[in-house]
Each structure stands twice: as structure tokens, then as C-alpha cells.
Amino acid sequence: MVSMRDLLECGVHFGHQTRRWNPKMKKFIFGERKGIYVIDLQKTLRYFRYTYNIVRDAAAEGKTILFVGTKKQAGGAIKEYAEKCGMPYVNHRWLGGMMTNFGTIRQSIRKLEVIEKMEEDGSIKLLTKKEALMLTRKKEKLLAYLGGIRYMKTQPDMIFVIDTVKEKIAVQEANRLKIPVVAPLDTNCDPDLVDFPIPGNDDAIRSVQLFCQEMAEAINEGKALREQDGEANEEQPISEEEKKEVLEEAMSEEDFEGDKE
């Protein structure tokens, strides 16, 4: 469980410049120093511990918690700690509809599985060099966008977000679907959009890493309480027709749906 010393050492108390703030965050601000808001770490500690227990209990109930953080400071930690606790993640770019249009996202993940099967069974070697190259490129693009959620069979039960301002589309989708949002809140954030806020710096690498590490720890603790193995992912057979469809799509050089802003 996080301590006051952890928060101080990781710079969790440093907010944004005073000209860049959301007035709704006033109750979480301790004061101002050299034009920078200082977050009240007593409140951070209280919210952190409360949220830790919420996340732990969700994991103990077998719920899926999606990690989201696509900015440079967050991408590495999001992937590392999501993998450490066996949860899905998005760290490249949030594609509109990842939750609200999940069926279409699952179809794209299926295409990734088809290409990988073609590589595995050798059928990709029967294609021309150009066809094989186009399929490989498509696979790389699909992996970049969807690799972290490929085993997520349904919408998540909760999302953990680093930087709710940058990830506003993900937060909006979660709010629309009534999926609880857990997130650190910097002084420029809107607390009304987050179900389980933790006031703190969401920009500094060490601070971001601490948040991710603690959430992963809470999840692993919850999983241990659950005392049962997760269900194995069933592999769905891939037909020749599916292989043909994915190849035709790759050869058409159409932009992957998610490329469009």
C-alpha cells in the first residue's frame, strides 16, 4: 500500500501552472508555489487507499479492468503493469468506439488472429511476395492498436486512465456505458467525470509509474483473494474463407478504420 513518502519521492504533489487549472479541483489543492499548484497529499493518500481497495475488490470478483494511457510518459508503464496483473491495455492510441462499438473492434482482432494463423500453418508462404508483405503490414498495424486488448472478450467492467484530459474520448465512452473510471487527477482535470479519483500528478514519469504499480498490486491482491484460475481463452477455428477475406482487405490498401481521427 502506498505511503506518504512514496507520494513525495515520486512528485505526486506537483500540479500544473496556476493558469492551467480546473476550478473544480480547488478542494484537492493545498496551495501554490512559484506559479505551480501543490496538491494536498493528505487527501491524495486517503483517496489512494480507498481506490486501491475498490480496485482490489473488483479484481476479487473477477472483473476486467482496462488500463488506458497513450501519452509518451504513460505508454511504457501502462503496458508493463497491465501485463504484470494480466489486464488488457491501450497504450498506442485510443480508437473511437473501442468500448461503444466493441463488436467492430472484435472483428478487427479476429483479422489479426487470421493473419497469425496463416503464418503459423504456412499458408502465407503460398502467396505472392506483395500479398505476404501487405498482410504483414496489416498485422503490425492491428497489433499496435489492438494487441493490448486482443484477449478482452467483452467490454471492461472498469477502466484505469492516466490523463483524463488527453484520454477524454475513452472517459466519455466509459461514462456513456456507465463503466466506472479510476484515474489520478491533476489540477487541470474535471473530477465530475471520474468515479474513483486520486488527486495527483499525471505527467511526471515516476508519478505515473507509481499509480500504475499500485493499481497492478491491488489487482493481483484481489486475484489472490479470488483463489481460482481464470478461464482459458478458447481458440476459434479459422476458415479458408476468413483467410481469403483478410487477404483481399489487406491488398485493397484501405486504411484501417482506426486510422481516421
From Swiss-Prot:
Keywords of this entry: Ribonucleoprotein, Ribosomal protein
- Ribosomal protein in keyword set: yes
Q: Is the keyword Lipoprotein in the record?
A: no
Organism superkingdom = Bacteria
Coiled-coil ranges per UniProt: none
Q: Where is this region: Disordered?
A: 222-261
GO CC, sorted alphabetically, is: cytosolic small ribosomal subunit
Q: Which GO terms describe its molecular function?
A: structural constituent of ribosome
* Cross-referenced Pfam families: Ribosomal_S2 (PF00318)
Gene Ontology biological-process entries: translation
Q: List all Acidic residues biased stretches.
A: 230-239, 248-261
The text of the family note is: Belongs to the universal ribosomal protein uS2 family.
User: Which named protein is this?
Assistant: Small ribosomal subunit protein uS2
User: From what organism does this protein derive?
Assistant: Campylobacter lari (strain RM2100 / D67 / ATCC BAA-1060)
